Swiss-Prot record:
UniProt feature, compositional bias: Basic and acidic residues: 18-30
Function: Target of p53/TP53 with pro-apoptotic function.
Residue spans crossing the bilayer: 43-59
Protein's name according to its UniProt entry: Inhibitor of nuclear factor kappa-B kinase-interacting protein
Composition bias type Basic residues, residue spans: 1-11
Cytoplasm is among the record's keywords: no
Alphabetic keyword roster: Coiled coil, Endoplasmic reticulum, Glycoprotein, Membrane, Transmembrane, Transmembrane helix
Length: 373
């Protein structure tokens, strides 16, 4: 017994520096393992940053496109004001037609006024052609704007679908990282339990075989201590990784919460854009109706020109026939025929003015309906 005790006492003094050497020798592979864990973490963080930057860039582009849509809507408003200017031109044309009645009344004094009347009719024809050309340009612009609005709405819908897909991907990544962390923690706990059980077994075996294999037990204890130190370091590294993964999970949740109000804003702007598209379509339909009405007015103007030419030819024939008749009879007949012509012109002007008022009232009612909508 005394010999066994004397052997045990000097043993630890000699073998004390050996675990330090072994622990120093095992630091390098553990450090290498930590570098290996850092590479996928940095890659995942870079991927998340790249995706967040891409999403921010998409949102910025969509805001720029929405600003362009607003500018195009303002252009539509300016074009509607130009259309009101065309309506004022039509009212001026009606005023000119009323002035033609006065010129017909003054036709008894001299035939030179007839040439002026023909010039005014030609000017009216030119103004009508200009109005038709401007209306064609407006219809083309409205068609182009309708196509642009439809393209923009399609782009908004696509971006919303992409945003929802990206949020789902972020959620799945966060869940996967959380599950990986929990698995690593559980595995580390199981390893610690196994090590504690091994320590108990080793202690029991040392108590049983302390007399026979003291040196072997000391070596086993040194190995176990080295393993414990390495395992504790591994556990500390796993805890650090758990902290980093939890911080990353929090960052991902914050990013998701920051993207959700942007998605809701996009969804809130969609109905306004759709209402604008519907209003533009209605305005285009109203313009088509006004074009038809303007075509009817041009037909009426051509008929009026034919009637005026017929009246001029009749007046010339009357002058030729009245050259051989007395002066008094010629004046009476001329007055009667001019009264008849005035009546015809007055009836035609009343009919044309009534048709124009009806078309303008219908257009105003349709515009009120679109504004109420």
């Amino acid at each position: 017994m005394s010999e066994v005790k004397s052997r045990k006492k000097p043993g630890p003094k000699v073998a004390a520096p050996e675990p330090e050497k072994r622990s120093d020798g095992r630091k390098n592979p553990e450090a290498r393992g930590g570098a290996g864990w850092a590479d996928p973490r940095t890659g995942l963080s870079l991927l998340s940053l790249a995706t967040s930057l891409g999403l921010a860039w998409l949102v910025f582009q969509q805001s720029e496109k929405f600003a362009k849509v607003e500018n195009q809507y303002r252009l539509l408003q300016t074009e509607s004001s130009e259309f009101q200017g065309l309506q004022s031109k039509i009212s001026l044309i009606s005023n000119k037609l009323e002035s033609t009645e006065n010129t017909l009344q003054e036709a008894t004094s001299s035939m030179s006024l007839m040439t002026q009347f023909e010039q005014e009719v030609a000017g009216l024809q030119r103004s009508i052609h200009d109005i038709e050309n401007s209306e064609e340009m407006l219809t083309q612009k409205l068609q182009n704007l309708n196509e642009k609005f439809q393209n923009i709405t399609d782009l908004w819908k696509r971006t919303l679908v992409e945003m929802s897909d990206n949020t789902a991907v972020f959620k799945s990544e966060a869940k996967s990282t959380h599950s990986e962390v929990t698995l690593k923690i559980n595995s580390a706990e199981q390893e610690i339990k196994l090590l504690t059980e091994r320590l108990k077994d080793l202690e029991d075996s040392t108590l049983r075989n302390i007399r026979t294999v003291s040196r072997q037990e000391e070596e086993d204890l040194l190995r176990v201590e080295a393993q414990l130190s390495s395992d504790t370091k591994a556990v500390e590294k796993l805890e650090e990784e758990q902290r980093t993964l939890l911080a990353r999970d929090e960052d991902l949740t914050d990013k998701l919460s920051s993207y959700e109000p942007k998605v809701e804003e996009c969804k809130a702007h969609l109905p306004t854009i759709e209402n604008a598209v519907h209003s533009v379509l209605r305005v285009s339909q109203d313009l088509i109706g006004t074009e038809r009405k303007m075509e009817e007015l041009t037909v009426q103007m051509f008929n009026m020109e034919d009637d005026m030419l017929k009246a001029v030819s009749e007046i010339m024939e009357m002058q030729n026939t009245l050259e051989g008749i007395q002066y008094d009879n010629s004046l009476l007949k001329m007055q009667n025929e001019l009264v008849v012509l005035k009546g015809k012109v007055h009836d035609f002007m009343a009919y044309s003015s009534a048709g124009e008022k009806g078309t303008l009232e219908e257009y105003n009612l349709e515009n009120k309906g679109t504004d109420d909508y």
